Amino acid sequence: MEIRVMKAEDYDKLYELLMTIKGFGIRSIDDSREGVARFLKRNPTTSMTAWDGDTLIGAILCGHDGRRGCLYHVCVRKGYRRHGVGKAMVVACMEALRKEEINKVTLIAFTKNDIGNAFWNKIGWTEREDLNYYDFTLNEANITAFIEED
């Protein structure tokens, strides 16, 4: 397995991987080729990919605003889970954030994502129960489509 920084050229394999993750939400604008390229241009060193030869087996979009980092779309291809791929990518993202003097990183996990929530707890992340999460949609055209569950 090789962990490396995500590049815009990885998009086709990234999209194919995301489409295999059941229950995953893909946004029509943010997760388009242009949306991912825009994110990577703003955060050129912090998003990671995991490879087994030419096969993309994991990916994390990771960025920051100068104060706090955030992980988006953390995923590992089925069949490669529970082999350290996710943890290796998370560690690489956190190291990249530290180099940019970011001191804290957050993520959002759906409450129904039992596998993901178990993973974050296992690797030492803290679930916050002292705050509420709010969002506001600025572009109604940025539609989220969820990958069908089996």
Give residue ranges: language-model regions.
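A short beta-loop-alpha structural element at the N-terminal edge
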Residues: 1-14
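A conserved beta-turn-beta hairpin within the catalytic core of GNAT-like acetyltransferases
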Residues: 63-72, 81, 128-131
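Conserved GNAT acetyl-CoA-binding A-motif
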Residues: 97-109
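Conserved acetyl-CoA-binding loop-helix of GNAT-fold acetyltransferases
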Residues: 82-95, 122
